[in-house]
Amino acid sequence: MFRARLTHAQRTGMQVADCQSCVHLFPEDGSDMDAFPADAQAFVHRFFPTVARLTAQGFEGGPTIKGQFDAAVVHVPRSKQLARHLVNWACQLAPDGIIYVDGAKTQGIESLMKAVKAITPLMGVVSAAHGRLFWFHATGQFALWDASSLREIENGFKTQAGIFSAEHIDPGSAILANALEPLSGHIADLGAGWGYLSHHVLSEHPVSSIDLVEADHAAASCSRLNCDDTRAQVFWQGIDSWKAQKSYDHVVMNPPFHEGRKGEPDLGKAFIRKAAGILKKKGKLWMVANRHLPYEETLSQLFVDFRAVAGDKRFKVLLASAPRNTRL
């Protein structure tokens, strides 16, 4: 929606000066980047599918970026702490330029704008398309918003701002870990996050190897620290783009089911299809999901047998065995 709000701002008198270079922090679509009048556009994003999509569209960027820019656009993410971190980072990337901050009301743009306004004057604000766009001159006064450092939570696990369950062990993952039967052989952890499940498997089960697949670059980096074991290998990949190099005896996973703030059960179903395609003939899938999510039909289509083996009022642990000749 950045394009819509920027267009509205220009129609109502906002002057956006042409500049040679602009960096976008956490854009979701190349059309939003194209909307900004700059000769060269770059981006920062840590979600692999988005990085791959924007790179394929001809934009330069990735989880980190070097250099300085004439302007920066912050596309506000869901995480409050990450959003503040991006504002500070934008000021570092465009220290002499204008910082544009865009987001939907459901993303917390109102509270972020108030926090920015308390530190530095705003140059302008527009409201459109259920969100806001505001802008200000870059300043070094946001240094306290930096959240690039790792944090240590319970049991010494390392996490970082903006990743899933950054403050504590996810309760669904904990239920799944406690429900696992003795595992052995080759394991895959799909959507591994910062590595809790894999750490548990490595600590409690005599496995030969475990491959962690995670799309969030920050989470994947944390998982390398939390699973510092020669049997573990971490892949920063999306579930669709990752190509397994072997078949697995077990897959463990706590798949995501949100696209932004909207629940998307199809995300979890894609994970189930991936698991069915990489398991051995007698392999097993262990997964945890929110109790209301409708995964049973997909499991019955792709596996010879499945059943619920644990859970509580919020979560269910599902065990599926013997994929039905499904190969990706």
Region roles according to the model:
Residues T120-E152, N290-L328:
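Class I S-adenosyl-L-methionine
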Residues A71-K80, L190-G195, Y248-K262, A275:
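Conserved proline-anchored active-site loop of SAM-dependent methyltransferases
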Residues D96-K105, K282-A289:
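Conserved beta-strand signature within the Rossmann-like core of class I S-adenosyl-L-methionine
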Residues M1-T55, P171-M253:
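Conserved SAM/SAH cofactor-binding pocket of Class I
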Residues R84-G97, K269-K281:
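A short glycine-rich, Lys/Arg-flanked "PGG" loop and its adjoining helix->strand segment in the class I
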Residues E60-F69, W236-K243:
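Short acidic low-complexity segments
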Residues R46, A104, E214-A218, L267, ...:
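Short beta->alpha hinge that forms the Motif I/post-I loop of the SAM-binding pocket
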Residues S127-S184:
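SAM-dependent Rossmann-like transferase core, predominantly class I methyltransferases
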